[in-house]
Amino acid sequence: MNSKAMQALIFLGFLATSCLAQAPAPAPTTVTPPPTALPPVTAETPSPIASPPVPVNEPTPAPTTSPTTSPVASPPQTDAPAPGPSAGLTPTSSPAPGPDGAADAPSAAWANKAFLVGTAVAGALYAVVLA
């Protein structure tokens, strides 16, 4: 095999490795068994003779008495703060601080170990092609 064919083969391997490293993993599929057929339910015929209703003894209501004093509204409570903007939300206050620059979240691609390994293999193949 000449060197150009070998380089083309290695380059195709690099391309396939790079594509596989970036492709998402297939979702696992579960096969559910088909539902089993249930026998038809037969309705039972009601008996032709109806039973008489059972008498219910209702309790007698208690006599109601009217209150002697009329209800009066209670005075408002004063321990709650008055509605309105608080002192910290005035237009002259500074905006809230942003996220700390040193606390950046890791990249999702580099957190995936399969992507990292695939990229390392692709880099090795690329180095072989350029050598």
Curated annotation (Swiss-Prot):
Cleavable signal peptide: 1-21
Protein name in UniProt: Classical arabinogalactan protein 2
Record has Phosphoprotein as a keyword: no
Gene responsible for this protein: AGP2
Keywords assigned: Cell membrane, Glycoprotein, GPI-anchor, Hydroxylation, Lipoprotein, Membrane, Proteoglycan, Pyrrolidone carboxylic acid, Signal
Function: Proteoglycan that seems to be implicated in diverse developmental roles such as differentiation, cell-cell recognition, embryogenesis and programmed cell death.
Region of interest: Disordered: 24-106
Residue ranges listed under propeptide: 108-131
Cited InterPro entries: AGP (IPR044959)
